[in-house]
Protein backbone atom coordinates (compact mmCIF):
# COMPACT_ATOMS: atom_id res chain seq x y z
CA UNK A 1 0.00 0.00 0.00
CA UNK A 2 1.31 3.47 -0.94
CA UNK A 3 0.55 6.43 1.31
CA UNK A 4 1.50 10.10 0.91
CA UNK A 5 1.92 12.71 3.62
CA UNK A 6 3.17 16.26 3.21
CA UNK A 7 5.87 18.23 5.00
CA UNK A 8 8.45 20.89 4.09
CA UNK A 9 12.19 21.45 3.65
CA UNK A 10 13.62 24.77 4.85
CA UNK A 11 16.80 26.12 3.24
CA UNK A 12 17.48 29.64 4.43
CA UNK A 13 14.13 31.41 4.15
CA UNK A 14 13.14 29.35 1.12
CA UNK A 15 10.69 26.52 1.77
CA UNK A 16 9.95 23.59 -0.53
CA UNK A 17 6.94 21.33 -0.11
CA UNK A 18 8.09 17.74 0.43
CA UNK A 19 5.96 14.69 -0.32
CA UNK A 20 6.65 11.80 2.05
CA UNK A 21 5.80 8.54 0.28
CA UNK A 22 5.58 5.35 2.34
CA UNK A 23 5.19 1.91 0.79
CA UNK A 24 5.11 -1.52 2.44
CA UNK A 25 5.97 -4.93 1.03
CA UNK A 26 7.23 -8.27 2.26
CA UNK A 27 10.43 -8.07 4.24
CA UNK A 28 11.77 -6.65 7.49
CA UNK A 29 13.96 -3.72 6.46
CA UNK A 30 13.51 0.06 6.46
CA UNK A 31 14.72 2.07 3.45
CA UNK A 32 14.80 5.87 3.39
CA UNK A 33 15.55 7.72 0.13
CA UNK A 34 15.41 11.36 -0.93
CA UNK A 35 18.75 12.99 0.02
CA UNK A 36 18.20 12.77 3.78
CA UNK A 37 20.88 13.85 6.25
CA UNK A 38 21.92 11.95 9.39
CA UNK A 39 19.15 13.37 11.61
CA UNK A 40 16.50 12.25 9.11
CA UNK A 41 18.04 8.80 8.68
CA UNK A 42 17.95 8.33 12.46
CA UNK A 43 14.20 8.96 12.45
CA UNK A 44 13.38 5.24 12.13
CA UNK A 45 14.64 4.50 15.64
CA UNK A 46 12.68 7.42 17.13
CA UNK A 47 9.53 6.49 15.21
CA UNK A 48 9.76 2.83 16.22
CA UNK A 49 10.09 3.69 19.92
CA UNK A 50 7.31 6.31 19.71
CA UNK A 51 4.90 3.85 18.09
CA UNK A 52 5.60 1.09 20.61
CA UNK A 53 5.35 3.46 23.61
CA UNK A 54 1.98 4.73 22.34
CA UNK A 55 0.44 1.28 22.04
CA UNK A 56 1.07 0.61 18.36
CA UNK A 57 2.96 -2.26 16.80
CA UNK A 58 5.73 -1.54 14.34
CA UNK A 59 4.80 -3.31 11.09
CA UNK A 60 6.94 -6.41 10.49
CA UNK A 61 7.26 -5.60 6.82
CA UNK A 62 9.68 -4.02 4.41
CA UNK A 63 9.10 -0.24 4.64
CA UNK A 64 10.33 2.11 1.91
CA UNK A 65 10.02 5.85 2.54
CA UNK A 66 10.87 8.47 -0.07
CA UNK A 67 11.14 12.22 0.49
CA UNK A 68 10.38 13.97 -2.79
CA UNK A 69 11.78 16.01 -4.53
CA UNK A 70 14.94 13.95 -4.16
CA UNK A 71 17.34 16.66 -5.35
CA UNK A 72 16.74 18.89 -2.30
CA UNK A 73 18.65 18.03 0.85
CA UNK A 74 16.42 17.15 3.81
CA UNK A 75 17.90 18.26 7.13
CA UNK A 76 16.67 18.18 10.72
CA UNK A 77 14.24 16.04 12.66
CA UNK A 78 10.99 17.67 11.53
CA UNK A 79 10.27 14.74 9.19
CA UNK A 80 9.57 12.33 12.08
CA UNK A 81 5.85 13.13 12.26
CA UNK A 82 4.98 12.80 8.54
CA UNK A 83 7.03 9.58 8.31
CA UNK A 84 5.30 8.12 11.38
CA UNK A 85 1.85 9.06 10.07
CA UNK A 86 2.73 7.55 6.71
CA UNK A 87 3.71 4.26 8.37
CA UNK A 88 0.50 4.23 10.44
CA UNK A 89 -1.61 4.96 7.36
CA UNK A 90 0.13 2.28 5.31
CA UNK A 91 -0.59 -0.13 8.18
CA UNK A 92 -4.30 0.67 8.07
CA UNK A 93 -4.52 2.91 11.16
CA UNK A 94 -5.83 5.99 9.29
CA UNK A 95 -9.52 5.91 8.43
CA UNK A 96 -9.91 9.14 6.41
CA UNK A 97 -8.36 11.05 3.51
CA UNK A 98 -7.42 14.06 5.67
CA UNK A 99 -3.71 13.37 5.17
CA UNK A 100 -4.08 14.88 1.70
CA UNK A 101 -5.29 18.21 3.08
CA UNK A 102 -2.77 18.89 5.86
CA UNK A 103 0.93 19.60 5.98
CA UNK A 104 2.65 18.36 9.14
CA UNK A 105 6.07 18.77 10.77
CA UNK A 106 7.50 17.76 14.10
CA UNK A 107 10.19 15.78 15.89
CA UNK A 108 9.13 12.73 17.87
CA UNK A 109 10.42 11.90 21.33
CA UNK A 110 10.72 8.26 22.30
CA UNK A 111 7.51 8.63 24.32
CA UNK A 112 5.62 9.90 21.28
CA UNK A 113 5.56 13.54 22.34
CA UNK A 114 6.12 16.16 19.65
CA UNK A 115 9.23 18.29 20.08
CA UNK A 116 9.58 21.83 18.62
CA UNK A 117 11.20 22.42 15.26
CA UNK A 118 12.85 25.40 13.58
CA UNK A 119 11.21 27.37 10.80
CA UNK A 120 7.55 26.86 11.71
CA UNK A 121 6.57 30.31 10.43
CA UNK A 122 8.04 30.03 6.90
CA UNK A 123 6.60 26.49 6.71
CA UNK A 124 3.14 27.88 7.58
CA UNK A 125 3.50 30.51 4.86
CA UNK A 126 4.40 27.77 2.38
CA UNK A 127 1.41 25.66 3.46
CA UNK A 128 -0.95 28.53 2.73
CA UNK A 129 0.77 29.22 -0.58
CA UNK A 130 0.29 25.57 -1.59
CA UNK A 131 -3.40 25.84 -0.58
CA UNK A 132 -3.34 23.20 2.15
CA UNK A 133 -6.34 23.33 4.45
CA UNK A 134 -4.17 23.33 7.53
CA UNK A 135 -0.84 22.72 9.23
CA UNK A 136 -0.04 20.43 12.17
CA UNK A 137 2.92 21.49 14.35
CA UNK A 138 4.22 20.75 17.86
CA UNK A 139 2.36 22.75 20.49
CA UNK A 140 5.50 24.77 21.29
CA UNK A 141 5.48 26.19 17.73
CA UNK A 142 1.79 27.02 17.60
CA UNK A 143 1.97 30.79 18.20
CA UNK A 144 4.50 31.54 15.49
CA UNK A 145 2.74 29.31 12.94
CA UNK A 146 -0.73 30.68 13.78
CA UNK A 147 0.38 34.13 12.62
CA UNK A 148 -0.54 33.06 9.07
CA UNK A 149 -4.13 33.89 8.13
CA UNK A 150 -6.42 31.68 6.03
CA UNK A 151 -4.73 28.54 7.34
CA UNK A 152 -5.95 26.20 10.08
CA UNK A 153 -3.03 25.64 12.44
CA UNK A 154 -3.18 22.86 15.04
CA UNK A 155 -0.73 22.52 17.89
CA UNK A 156 -0.43 18.89 18.99
CA UNK A 157 1.29 17.34 22.00
CA UNK A 158 1.58 13.67 21.01
CA UNK A 159 1.53 11.34 18.02
CA UNK A 160 -1.73 9.90 19.32
CA UNK A 161 -3.32 13.38 19.21
CA UNK A 162 -2.36 13.74 15.55
CA UNK A 163 -3.76 10.29 14.69
CA UNK A 164 -7.03 11.00 16.49
CA UNK A 165 -7.42 14.32 14.69
CA UNK A 166 -6.69 12.80 11.27
CA UNK A 167 -9.26 10.08 12.03
CA UNK A 168 -11.95 12.71 12.56
CA UNK A 169 -11.87 13.62 16.27
CA UNK A 170 -13.55 17.04 16.36
CA UNK A 171 -12.37 17.96 19.87
CA UNK A 172 -9.22 19.49 18.41
CA UNK A 173 -9.60 23.12 17.32
CA UNK A 174 -7.25 25.37 15.32
CA UNK A 175 -5.43 28.13 17.18
CA UNK A 176 -6.48 31.68 16.30
CA UNK A 177 -4.31 34.67 17.26
CA UNK A 178 -5.30 38.32 16.98
CA UNK A 179 -1.96 39.18 15.40
CA UNK A 180 -2.55 42.86 14.76
CA UNK A 181 -3.80 43.60 18.29
CA UNK A 182 -0.84 41.86 19.94
CA UNK A 183 1.59 43.44 17.49
CA UNK A 184 0.50 47.02 18.08
CA UNK A 185 0.10 46.58 21.85
CA UNK A 186 3.75 45.57 22.24
CA UNK A 187 5.31 48.05 19.82
CA UNK A 188 5.95 50.81 22.34
CA UNK A 189 7.03 48.73 25.34
CA UNK A 190 10.74 49.54 25.64
CA UNK A 191 13.02 48.47 28.44
CA UNK A 192 15.24 51.56 28.13
CA UNK A 193 14.46 55.24 27.54
CA UNK A 194 16.60 58.27 26.72
CA UNK A 195 15.04 60.17 29.62
CA UNK A 196 17.19 58.00 31.90
CA UNK A 197 20.38 59.47 30.40
CA UNK A 198 21.53 62.74 31.94
CA UNK A 199 23.77 64.93 29.84
CA UNK A 200 25.46 63.75 26.62
CA UNK A 201 23.18 65.97 24.53
CA UNK A 202 25.57 66.05 21.57
CA UNK A 203 25.69 62.25 21.44
CA UNK A 204 21.91 62.02 21.72
CA UNK A 205 21.68 64.39 18.79
CA UNK A 206 24.06 62.23 16.76
CA UNK A 207 21.96 59.14 17.55
CA UNK A 208 18.81 61.01 16.53
CA UNK A 209 20.39 61.89 13.19
CA UNK A 210 21.54 58.30 12.73
CA UNK A 211 18.05 56.95 13.48
CA UNK A 212 16.39 59.47 11.17
CA UNK A 213 18.56 58.59 8.17
CA UNK A 214 19.43 54.95 8.86
CA UNK A 215 23.10 55.91 9.20
CA UNK A 216 25.77 53.69 10.71
CA UNK A 217 27.47 55.32 13.70
CA UNK A 218 30.56 54.82 15.83
CA UNK A 219 31.11 56.34 19.28
CA UNK A 220 34.65 57.03 20.48
CA UNK A 221 35.25 57.71 24.15
CA UNK A 222 36.88 56.53 27.40
CA UNK A 223 35.51 53.71 29.58
CA UNK A 224 32.47 54.69 31.61
CA UNK A 225 31.37 57.50 29.33
CA UNK A 226 28.03 55.87 28.53
CA UNK A 227 28.58 54.42 25.04
CA UNK A 228 26.80 51.12 25.70
CA UNK A 229 24.06 52.80 27.72
CA UNK A 230 23.23 55.15 24.85
CA UNK A 231 23.39 52.41 22.21
CA UNK A 232 20.88 50.24 24.11
CA UNK A 233 18.37 53.08 23.96
CA UNK A 234 18.59 53.57 20.20
CA UNK A 235 15.73 51.13 19.36
CA UNK A 236 13.37 53.28 21.43
CA UNK A 237 13.68 56.15 18.92
CA UNK A 238 13.67 54.14 15.69
CA UNK A 239 10.48 54.10 13.59
CA UNK A 240 8.15 51.23 14.54
CA UNK A 241 8.30 48.00 12.58
CA UNK A 242 5.71 47.60 9.86
CA UNK A 243 3.82 44.30 9.70
CA UNK A 244 5.77 43.33 6.56
CA UNK A 245 9.10 44.06 8.27
CA UNK A 246 7.99 42.18 11.37
CA UNK A 247 6.98 39.11 9.36
CA UNK A 248 10.36 39.04 7.58
CA UNK A 249 12.27 39.51 10.84
CA UNK A 250 10.21 36.85 12.63
CA UNK A 251 10.89 34.35 9.85
CA UNK A 252 14.65 34.76 10.32
CA UNK A 253 14.39 34.23 14.08
CA UNK A 254 12.08 31.26 13.49
CA UNK A 255 14.61 29.57 11.19
CA UNK A 256 17.34 30.23 13.77
CA UNK A 257 15.22 28.76 16.57
CA UNK A 258 15.35 32.01 18.55
CA UNK A 259 11.62 32.52 19.11
CA UNK A 260 10.23 31.84 22.55
CA UNK A 261 7.08 29.76 23.01
CA UNK A 262 5.05 32.91 23.79
CA UNK A 263 6.15 34.86 20.70
CA UNK A 264 3.96 35.24 17.64
CA UNK A 265 5.34 38.26 15.77
CA UNK A 266 8.43 40.25 16.76
CA UNK A 267 7.01 43.69 17.48
CA UNK A 268 10.17 45.70 18.17
CA UNK A 269 13.28 46.24 16.12
CA UNK A 270 15.98 43.70 17.05
CA UNK A 271 19.01 44.83 19.04
CA UNK A 272 21.90 42.39 18.78
CA UNK A 273 25.09 42.92 20.79
CA UNK A 274 27.54 40.03 20.20
CA UNK A 275 30.70 39.70 22.29
CA UNK A 276 33.96 40.82 20.68
CA UNK A 277 35.22 37.21 20.63
CA UNK A 278 32.55 36.27 18.06
CA UNK A 279 33.64 34.19 15.06
CA UNK A 280 33.02 34.91 11.39
CA UNK A 281 30.42 32.15 11.12
CA UNK A 282 28.52 33.35 14.19
CA UNK A 283 28.52 36.91 12.84
CA UNK A 284 27.47 36.40 9.21
CA UNK A 285 25.96 32.90 9.41
CA UNK A 286 27.03 29.48 8.19
CA UNK A 287 27.53 25.92 9.30
CA UNK A 288 26.78 22.61 7.60
CA UNK A 289 23.11 23.56 7.57
CA UNK A 290 23.61 27.33 7.09
CA UNK A 291 21.93 29.25 9.90
CA UNK A 292 21.43 33.02 10.21
CA UNK A 293 24.24 34.93 11.89
CA UNK A 294 24.05 38.01 14.09
CA UNK A 295 23.85 40.35 11.08
CA UNK A 296 20.69 38.58 9.87
CA UNK A 297 19.20 38.37 13.37
CA UNK A 298 19.67 42.17 13.47
CA UNK A 299 17.73 42.59 10.18
CA UNK A 300 15.47 45.67 10.35
CA UNK A 301 17.13 46.58 13.63
CA UNK A 302 20.48 47.39 15.24
CA UNK A 303 23.78 45.51 15.38
CA UNK A 304 25.86 46.89 18.24
CA UNK A 305 29.58 46.08 18.24
CA UNK A 306 31.04 47.16 21.57
CA UNK A 307 34.82 47.68 21.66
CA UNK A 308 34.97 47.32 17.88
CA UNK A 309 38.80 47.23 17.53
CA UNK A 310 38.87 44.21 19.87
CA UNK A 311 37.12 42.10 17.23
CA UNK A 312 39.55 40.23 15.00
CA UNK A 313 40.40 41.95 11.73
CA UNK A 314 39.04 39.06 9.66
CA UNK A 315 35.69 39.22 11.47
CA UNK A 316 35.39 42.96 10.89
CA UNK A 317 36.23 42.66 7.20
CA UNK A 318 33.38 40.22 6.49
CA UNK A 319 30.98 43.04 7.39
CA UNK A 320 31.91 45.09 4.34
CA UNK A 321 29.78 43.37 1.70
CA UNK A 322 26.67 42.84 3.89
CA UNK A 323 26.73 46.52 4.85
CA UNK A 324 26.69 47.41 1.15
CA UNK A 325 24.32 44.75 -0.23
CA UNK A 326 22.00 44.36 2.78
CA UNK A 327 21.98 40.61 2.26
CA UNK A 328 24.39 37.72 2.83
CA UNK A 329 24.81 34.70 0.58
CA UNK A 330 26.28 31.55 2.16
CA UNK A 331 27.61 29.20 -0.51
CA UNK A 332 27.87 25.45 -0.22
CA UNK A 333 29.00 22.88 -2.79
CA UNK A 334 25.50 22.06 -4.05
CA UNK A 335 23.39 25.04 -3.03
CA UNK A 336 23.37 28.63 -1.79
CA UNK A 337 21.44 30.10 1.12
CA UNK A 338 20.56 33.79 1.24
CA UNK A 339 19.52 35.79 4.29
CA UNK A 340 18.57 39.49 4.41
CA UNK A 341 20.64 41.70 6.70
CA UNK A 342 19.52 45.32 6.43
CA UNK A 343 20.66 46.68 9.79
CA UNK A 344 22.05 49.81 11.39
CA UNK A 345 25.60 49.29 12.59
CA UNK A 346 26.29 51.03 15.90
CA UNK A 347 29.84 50.59 17.16
CA UNK A 348 31.82 51.86 20.11
CA UNK A 349 35.52 52.04 20.84
CA UNK A 350 38.06 53.53 23.17
CA UNK A 351 40.32 56.20 21.66
CA UNK A 352 43.45 54.18 22.49
CA UNK A 353 44.54 50.85 24.04
CA UNK A 354 44.46 52.19 27.62
CA UNK A 355 41.20 54.01 26.92
CA UNK A 356 42.08 57.47 28.23
CA UNK A 357 43.61 59.30 25.27
CA UNK A 358 42.38 62.91 25.52
CA UNK A 359 40.51 62.30 28.79
CA UNK A 360 40.80 65.34 31.12
CA UNK A 361 40.72 63.27 34.33
CA UNK A 362 43.11 60.42 33.44
CA UNK A 363 46.57 60.29 31.97
CA UNK A 364 47.00 58.30 28.76
CA UNK A 365 50.03 55.96 28.81
CA UNK A 366 49.93 55.12 25.08
CA UNK A 367 52.43 56.34 22.50
CA UNK A 368 51.23 57.93 19.23
CA UNK A 369 52.35 54.77 17.45
CA UNK A 370 50.26 52.55 19.71
CA UNK A 371 47.26 54.80 19.21
CA UNK A 372 47.69 54.71 15.44
CA UNK A 373 48.01 50.92 15.38
CA UNK A 374 44.91 50.64 17.54
CA UNK A 375 42.94 52.88 15.19
CA UNK A 376 44.21 50.98 12.15
CA UNK A 377 42.46 47.82 13.36
CA UNK A 378 39.39 49.28 11.66
CA UNK A 379 40.19 49.37 7.95
CA UNK A 380 39.48 52.33 5.70
CA UNK A 381 36.90 50.49 3.56
CA UNK A 382 34.93 49.50 6.68
CA UNK A 383 35.19 52.96 8.20
CA UNK A 384 34.00 54.30 4.86
CA UNK A 385 30.66 52.60 5.50
CA UNK A 386 30.15 54.36 8.85
CA UNK A 387 28.55 57.75 8.24
CA UNK A 388 28.73 59.29 11.71
CA UNK A 389 31.76 59.41 14.03
CA UNK A 390 30.77 60.73 17.44
CA UNK A 391 33.18 61.62 20.24
CA UNK A 392 31.95 61.23 23.80
CA UNK A 393 33.34 62.23 27.20
CA UNK A 394 32.28 61.00 30.62
CA UNK A 395 30.03 63.40 32.53
CA UNK A 396 31.55 64.32 35.94
CA UNK A 397 29.55 63.09 38.92
CA UNK A 398 29.15 66.61 40.29
CA UNK A 399 27.34 67.61 37.09
CA UNK A 400 25.33 64.40 36.90
CA UNK A 401 23.70 65.00 40.28
CA UNK A 402 22.57 68.48 39.22
CA UNK A 403 21.20 67.59 35.77
CA UNK A 404 17.53 67.15 34.99
CA UNK A 405 16.22 63.96 33.32
CA UNK A 406 16.73 63.92 29.58
CA UNK A 407 14.18 64.25 26.80
CA UNK A 408 12.01 61.10 26.60
CA UNK A 409 12.46 58.72 23.71
CA UNK A 410 8.86 59.26 22.57
CA UNK A 411 9.56 62.92 21.74
CA UNK A 412 12.74 62.10 19.83
CA UNK A 413 10.95 59.28 18.03
CA UNK A 414 8.27 61.65 16.73
CA UNK A 415 10.93 63.76 15.00
CA UNK A 416 12.62 60.66 13.61
CA UNK A 417 9.35 59.33 12.18
CA UNK A 418 8.61 62.67 10.50
CA UNK A 419 12.05 62.66 8.88
CA UNK A 420 11.63 59.03 7.73
CA UNK A 421 8.23 59.87 6.23
CA UNK A 422 9.86 62.62 4.18
CA UNK A 423 12.43 60.12 2.90
CA UNK A 424 9.80 57.49 2.13
CA UNK A 425 7.93 59.98 -0.04
CA UNK A 426 11.17 61.15 -1.68
CA UNK A 427 12.26 57.68 -2.75
CA UNK A 428 8.83 56.16 -3.43
CA UNK A 429 9.01 56.88 -7.17
CA UNK A 430 12.48 55.43 -7.67
CA UNK A 431 13.04 51.92 -9.12
CA UNK A 432 14.81 49.19 -7.16
CA UNK A 433 18.59 49.55 -6.98
CA UNK A 434 20.09 46.19 -8.01
CA UNK A 435 20.72 43.70 -5.21
CA UNK A 436 20.00 46.29 -2.51
CA UNK A 437 16.32 46.58 -3.35
CA UNK A 438 14.38 49.81 -2.97
CA UNK A 439 16.04 52.78 -1.26
CA UNK A 440 14.04 53.81 1.81
CA UNK A 441 16.40 56.07 3.78
CA UNK A 442 19.14 58.64 3.14
CA UNK A 443 21.98 56.32 4.13
CA UNK A 444 21.23 54.17 1.07
CA UNK A 445 21.43 56.97 -1.50
CA UNK A 446 23.66 56.47 -4.53
CA UNK A 447 25.93 59.16 -5.98
CA UNK A 448 23.30 60.03 -8.58
CA UNK A 449 20.69 60.45 -5.85
CA UNK A 450 23.05 62.71 -3.91
CA UNK A 451 23.28 65.05 -6.90
CA UNK A 452 19.50 65.02 -7.23
CA UNK A 453 18.41 65.29 -3.59
CA UNK A 454 21.37 66.57 -1.55
CA UNK A 455 23.22 69.00 -3.80
CA UNK A 456 24.28 71.98 -1.63
CA UNK A 457 24.23 75.57 -2.82
CA UNK A 458 27.42 77.38 -3.85
CA UNK A 459 28.11 78.85 -0.41
CA UNK A 460 27.65 75.49 1.31
CA UNK A 461 29.84 73.78 -1.26
CA UNK A 462 32.61 76.33 -0.68
CA UNK A 463 32.37 75.76 3.07
CA UNK A 464 32.58 72.00 2.58
CA UNK A 465 35.61 72.33 0.32
CA UNK A 466 37.37 74.59 2.83
CA UNK A 467 36.60 72.22 5.71
CA UNK A 468 37.96 69.24 3.82
CA UNK A 469 41.23 71.08 3.18
CA UNK A 470 41.71 72.50 6.68
CA UNK A 471 40.61 69.43 8.61
CA UNK A 472 42.43 67.05 6.25
CA UNK A 473 39.24 65.12 5.57
CA UNK A 474 39.59 62.20 3.20
CA UNK A 475 37.84 62.10 -0.16
CA UNK A 476 35.53 59.32 1.01
CA UNK A 477 34.08 61.68 3.62
CA UNK A 478 32.49 63.89 0.95
CA UNK A 479 29.46 61.77 0.07
CA UNK A 480 29.00 60.71 3.71
CA UNK A 481 28.78 64.35 4.76
CA UNK A 482 26.16 65.05 2.10
CA UNK A 483 24.04 62.07 3.16
CA UNK A 484 24.12 63.09 6.81
CA UNK A 485 23.45 66.73 5.89
CA UNK A 486 20.39 65.63 3.91
CA UNK A 487 19.09 63.84 7.01
CA UNK A 488 19.75 66.87 9.22
CA UNK A 489 17.81 68.98 6.72
CA UNK A 490 14.92 66.49 6.84
CA UNK A 491 14.85 66.72 10.65
CA UNK A 492 14.69 70.50 10.31
CA UNK A 493 11.93 70.26 7.69
CA UNK A 494 14.11 71.96 5.08
CA UNK A 495 13.78 71.08 1.38
CA UNK A 496 17.32 72.27 0.64
CA UNK A 497 20.63 71.34 2.21
CA UNK A 498 21.96 74.55 3.75
CA UNK A 499 25.26 75.63 5.29
CA UNK A 500 24.12 74.93 8.85
CA UNK A 501 23.31 71.33 7.89
CA UNK A 502 26.67 70.88 6.18
CA UNK A 503 28.47 72.32 9.21
CA UNK A 504 26.84 69.85 11.61
CA UNK A 505 27.54 66.93 9.26
CA UNK A 506 31.22 67.90 9.04
CA UNK A 507 31.43 67.62 12.81
CA UNK A 508 30.50 63.93 12.55
CA UNK A 509 33.60 62.92 10.55
CA UNK A 510 36.23 62.92 13.31
CA UNK A 511 38.00 59.70 12.38
CA UNK A 512 38.51 60.91 8.81
CA UNK A 513 40.69 63.78 9.96
CA UNK A 514 44.28 63.21 8.99
CA UNK A 515 45.64 64.50 12.33
CA UNK A 516 43.25 62.60 14.60
CA UNK A 517 45.89 60.53 16.40
CA UNK A 518 48.06 63.57 17.15
CA UNK A 519 45.51 66.16 18.24
CA UNK A 520 43.63 64.49 21.14
CA UNK A 521 39.91 64.47 21.56
PLM features per residue range, with description:
Residues 300, 306-307, 318:
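Walker B catalytic acidic pair
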Residues 219-260, 325:
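Walker A/P-loop
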Residues 221, 285, 307:
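The Walker A (P-loop) glycine that initiates the GxxxxGKT/S ATP-binding motif of P-loop NTPases
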Residues 111, 305-312, 355:
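Catalytic P-loop NTPase motifs of RecA-like helicase/translocase cores
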Residues 33, 39-44, 59, 66-76, ...:
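Basic, amphipathic alpha-helical bundle interface domains used for macromolecular binding and assembly
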Residues 1-218, 222-225, 331, 477-478, ...:
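Peripheral, non-AAA+ core regions of ATP-driven protein-machinery
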Residues 170-209, 213, 240-295:
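P-loop NTPase nucleotide-binding/switch module
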